[in-house]
């Protein structure tokens, strides 16, 4: 029996190179080997200030990118989180067994809310509980995530264990965390110490998956390096050039040592030019297919409804099982 894999991407802003290398590309490989559930995290998206008019388009665009990148809806279950109401139902049940202190330790809330924690919405604070519900509702065996989500996954495991201990039986599967070594944490093109992010105010901090070829060339050309004239790899002392080398390696499959050796006497200009080209070679087909799919909204909606229908079968089984243990009438 195939193991179950679950993962998703928030439908906020344009998806970028970090989303592709850190998540989506890995999913393409997994769809042949696992029973995969890949969702559009639109409920998570509204924990920040997002316009109603933008959310609908963002959902469709993320779905189009999933498909354009190579996810096959006949092999995997693709759905919008908001179309499977059981996620919210299980989230409430998990809220009722999760100690408040556990949530207060979540660093991502502190990072996103900043100094205005008192003004932040409850949804942002309880975000990790909904994330736990997203995972546990499908009894996922494996959850591929970036390093920045590891704390949330550890919380998910803890919550599953609380439920199982409370009712003295394994109701919820305690998932394994899968963190890929290459491509998981692509950093900003403007600051090698910050993760590439959709929320960064500078568009030149990231390569968006729908960027034109010319814009990709511009962004890589202007990507920050440092004052040294040679290429070397050290994430602590040379984070920016190390990030560019990581991106090159992710596409070329060559070792960092070989890449450095190839460009040792050619300087940054040639390296950046070739890096832009290798990115374009890989992203252009995805961009073109995405634009084509965005013109067929009827097809995209069909995929969402089909995926949600399939997901709800699995999700409702888990929710009813948990509700029964709590004592609710099913």
Swiss-Prot record:
In chain numbering, motif 'KMSKS' region lies across 195-199
- Which Gene Ontology cellular component annotation is one that this UniProt entry carries? cytoplasm
Q: Which residues bind ATP?
A: 10-12, 18-19, 146-148, 186, 195-199
Where, by residue number, does L-tryptophan bind?
134
The UniProt entry, under InterPro entries, shows: aa-tRNA-synth_Ic (IPR002305), Rossmann-like_a/b/a_fold (IPR014729), Trp-tRNA-ligase (IPR002306), Trp-tRNA-ligase_bac-type (IPR024109), Trp-tRNA_synthetase (IPR050203)
Spell out the HAMAP family in the cross-references. Answer: Trp_tRNA_synth_B
Q: What positions does the record give for the motif labelled 'HIGH' region?
A: 11-19
Upper classification of the organism: Bacteria, Pseudomonadati, Pseudomonadota, Alphaproteobacteria, Rickettsiales
Keywords from UniProt, A to Z, are: Aminoacyl-tRNA synthetase, ATP-binding, Cytoplasm, Ligase, Nucleotide-binding, Protein biosynthesis
Q: What is this protein called?
A: Tryptophan--tRNA ligase
- NCBIfam families assigned: trpS (TIGR00233)
Q: Which domain of life is it from?
A: Bacteria
* GO molecular function per UniProt: ATP binding; tryptophan-tRNA ligase activity
Name its cellular compartments: Cytoplasm
The protein's job, in short, is: Catalyzes the attachment of tryptophan to tRNA(Trp).
- Name the catalysed reactions: tRNA(Trp) + L-tryptophan + ATP = L-tryptophyl-tRNA(Trp) + AMP + diphosphate + H(+)
Assembly and partners? Homodimer.
Question: What EC number(s) does the entry state?
Answer: 6.1.1.2
The record's family statement is: Belongs to the class-I aminoacyl-tRNA synthetase family.
Provide the GO biological process annotations. Answer: tryptophanyl-tRNA aminoacylation
């Amino acid at each position: 029996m195939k193991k179950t894999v679950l993962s998703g991407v928030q439908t906020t802003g344009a998806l970028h190179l970090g989303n592709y290398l850190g998540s989506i590309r890995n999913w393409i490989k997994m769809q042949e080997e696992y029973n995969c559930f890949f969702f559009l995290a639109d409920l998570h998206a509204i924990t920040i200030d997002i316009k109603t008019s933008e959310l609908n388009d963002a959902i469709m665009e993320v779905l189009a990118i999933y498909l354009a990148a190579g996810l096959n809806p006949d092999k995997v279950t693709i759905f919008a989180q908001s179309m499977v109401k059981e996620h919210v139902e299980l989230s409430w049940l998990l809220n009722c067994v999760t100690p408040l202190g556990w949530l207060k330790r979540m660093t991502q809330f502190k990072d996103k809310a900043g100094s205005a924690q008192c003004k932040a919405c409850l949804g942002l604070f309880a975000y990790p509980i909904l994330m736990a519900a997203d995972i546990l509702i499908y009894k996922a065996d494996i959850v591929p995530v970036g390093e920045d989500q590891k704390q949330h996954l550890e919380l998910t495991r803890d919550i599953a264990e609380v439920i199982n201990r409370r009712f003295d039986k394994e109701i919820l599967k305690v998932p394994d965390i899968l963190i890929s070594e290459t491509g998981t944490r692509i950093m900003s093109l403007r600051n090698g110490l910050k993760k590439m992010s959709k929320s960064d105010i500078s568009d030149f901090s990231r390569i968006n998956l729908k960027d034109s070829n010319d814009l990709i060339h511009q962004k890589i050309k202007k990507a920050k390096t440092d004052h040294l004239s040679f290429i070397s790899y050290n994430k602590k002392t040379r984070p920016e050039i190390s990030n560019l080398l990581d991106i090159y390696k992710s596409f070329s499959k060559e070792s960092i040592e070989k890449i450095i050796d190839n460009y040792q006497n050619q300087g940054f200009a040639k390296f950046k030019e070739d890096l832009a080209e290798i990115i374009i070679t890989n992203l252009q087909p995805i961009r073109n297919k995405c634009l084509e799919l965005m013109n067929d909204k009827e097809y995209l909606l069909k995929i969402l409804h089909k995926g949600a229908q399939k997901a709800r079968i699995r999700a409702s089984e888990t929710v009813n099982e948990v509700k029964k243990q709590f004592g609710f009438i099913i």
